[in-house]
């Protein structure tokens, strides 16, 4: 699981299915199911097309 120290305050920590931690470049970002991609707050992940939609 992610801790506050994992990523800077301007980023969001995402955990991959393998349990690895990564940083999303958005503050309060939304992690996609793959744990690799992420979207800005207020959007959702389009898993099929790997993009963010409103």
Curated annotation (Swiss-Prot):
Lineage: superkingdom: Eukaryota
Entries under SMART domains matching the protein: GRAN
InterPro entries given in the database record: Granulin (IPR000118), Granulin_fam (IPR039036), Granulin_sf (IPR037277)
Keywords assigned by UniProt, alphabetized: Disulfide bond, Neuropeptide, Secreted
Post-translational modification comment from the UniProt entry: Six disulfide bonds are present.
Single biological process term from Gene Ontology: neuropeptide signaling pathway
Primary location recorded for the protein, binned into one broad class: secreted
Any Pfam family: Granulin
Expression sites (tissue/organ): Brain.
Location in or out of the cell: Secreted
Gene Ontology cellular component list: extracellular region
Entry protein name: Pars intercerebralis major peptide D1
Organism ancestry: Eukaryota, Metazoa, Ecdysozoa, Arthropoda, Hexapoda
């Amino acid at each position: 699981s992610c801790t506050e120290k994992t990523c800077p305050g301007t980023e969001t920590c995402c955990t991959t299915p393998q349990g690895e931690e990564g940083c999303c470049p958005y503050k309060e970002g939304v992690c996609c199911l793959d744990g690799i991609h992420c979207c800005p707050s207020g959007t959702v992940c389009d898993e099929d097309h790997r993009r963010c939609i409103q």
